[in-house]
């Protein structure tokens, strides 16, 4: 990362969204203070999310909450929207805040065009925040990469 880049905080990112700076259809996430444009969702990507979510729901039931493409707040400068996050149940279903690392059991990214980014940049961001289990499902290579206990 360049030293002269001004990082944006999660609060500033939310304020920018509330002011309408981003187009409502833009798929963005905040990683290490930088606004990252996410790739368009392809059919194979969406199908993999659906199958993975279904399998997790069947095996875990109501013991956890399975969120798809919803924000998790890693720290003051990162709020990614992983394809799947398995989080602790919450009485308000996280109405008052996005899940934080201590509330996250597992994060899964489904990678088709984003494999390098998911395996390098996001792995580091999740590890730095204390996410204990991070998986990258490479749908093109048909591989699962597991990153555990950073």
Question: Which residue ranges define each predicted feature?
Answer:
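Gly/Pro/Ser/Thr-rich low-complexity, intrinsically disordered segments predominantly at protein N-termini
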Residues: 1-150
């Amino acid at each position: 990362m360049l030293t002269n880049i001004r990082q944006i905080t999660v609060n500033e990112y939310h304020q920018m969204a509330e002011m309408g700076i981003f187009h409502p259809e833009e798929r963005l996430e905040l990683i290490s203070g930088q606004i990252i444009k996410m790739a368009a969702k392809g059919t194979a990507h969406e199908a993999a999310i659906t199958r993975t979510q279904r399998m997790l729901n069947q095996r875990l039931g109501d013991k956890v909450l399975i969120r798809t493409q919803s924000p998790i707040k890693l720290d003051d400068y990162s709020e990614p929207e992983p394809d799947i996050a398995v989080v602790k149940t919450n009485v308000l279903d996280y109405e008052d805040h996005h899940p934080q690392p201590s509330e996250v059991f597992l994060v899964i990214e489904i990678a088709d065009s984003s494999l390098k980014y998911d395996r390098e940049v996001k792995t580091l961001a999740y590890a730095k925040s204390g996410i204990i289990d991070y998986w990258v499902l490479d749908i093109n290579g048909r591989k699962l990469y597991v990153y555990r206990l950073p």
